[in-house]
Regions:
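Active-site-proximal loop/turn and secondary-structure-junction residues that shape catalytic pockets
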Residues: 45, 78-80, 136-138, 163-165, ...
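Auxiliary Fe-S-binding modules of radical SAM enzymes
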Residues: 147-151, 171-249
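Conserved Radical SAM active-site core
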Residues: 1-129, 139, 168-178, 190-193
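Short secondary-structure capping micro-motifs at structural edges
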Residues: 117-122, 144-148, 183
């Protein structure tokens, strides 16, 4: 995992109680980053919030396409909306007479956003530098969001279990439908999850977290050959039982 990480990128903000507006200063920030970085993408916590238009989301993807040196992690609790956006993007591409894997960078050509030195012509699609992660906190959320996430035609898909509020079984989504289940212990190339991120809730009023929950998730990923990244325990420590787990795609 690259050493540099920016947590809040492409912030959309509500202005005077009206419609969200695109913060072009934040959106253009990746162009001025001097070194490749792992960048977290958020819209007030979720890029795929219902109030964000398809065109605004496309502008963010346009910037990600134009900066292939960076890796982007898009966290969402709304995989259904994300899937709808990818379907919209595919339909738009067909209506425009271009192939599904081609991205029209013009969607990101907003005023004062990308200068003439930055341009992309038909980059690879889905973008190889973007990881779409569903955020889940317990088994119920995983059962609801994981099937939708795996329908999204993203190059990389992952799960972010943060804050982890209970033990979670992600075995059904670690391997593809034709692969052996995680209990069989057969790591392979698959169309299931590509990454698992895990972390506890911290700060005042934090809810309960148990090391064994995170260790069990680690074991599930190890059996399936899926990278496991542990962020922090309830005290903010970046290790789990004294061991750091920072595997990455």
């Amino acid at each position: 995992m690259p050493a540099e990480k920016t947590d809040c990128y492409a912030k959309f903000q509500a202005y005077m109680g009206g419609d969200p507006w695109l913060n072009t200063k934040e959106l253009s920030a990746p162009f001025s980053a001097k070194k490749p970085a792992v960048i977290g993408v958020q819209f007030m916590g979720d890029l795929f919030h219902e109030s964000i238009t398809n065109e605004q989301i496309a502008a963010v993807f346009g910037v990600m396409a134009a900066t292939p040196q960076h890796q982007y992690v898009v966290l969402t609790k709304r995989p259904k909306r994300a899937l709808q956006w990818f379907e919209w993007m595919s339909a738009w591409a067909k209506a425009s007479g271009i192939k599904d894997y081609e991205v029209r960078i013009s969607l990101a050509q907003l005023d004062n956003l990308i200068d003439r030195r930055h341009h992309v012509v038909y980059p690879e699609w889905p973008l190889p530098n973007v990881i779409i992660c569903a955020s889940v906190e317990n088994q119920k959320a995983a059962d609801e969001r994981m099937p939708l996430l795996l329908q999204i035609p993203a190059r990389w898909r992952g799960v972010s279990v943060e804050p982890m509020l209970s033990g979670i079984n992600i075995g059904p989504w670690l391997l593809d439908e034709d692969g052996l289940d995680v209990d069989g212990g057969w790591p392979q190339n698959h169309d299931g999850l590509d990454l698992a991120i895990c972390g506890a809730e911290t700060g005042p009023g934090k809810r309960n977290f148990k090391d064994e929950w995170a260790l069990d998730l680690r074991d599930q990923c190890k059996i399936a050959g899926v990278p496991y990244f542990f962020k922090k325990d309830g005290s903010g420590n970046g290790s789990l039982c004294g061991v750091e787990y920072q595997e990455w795609i």
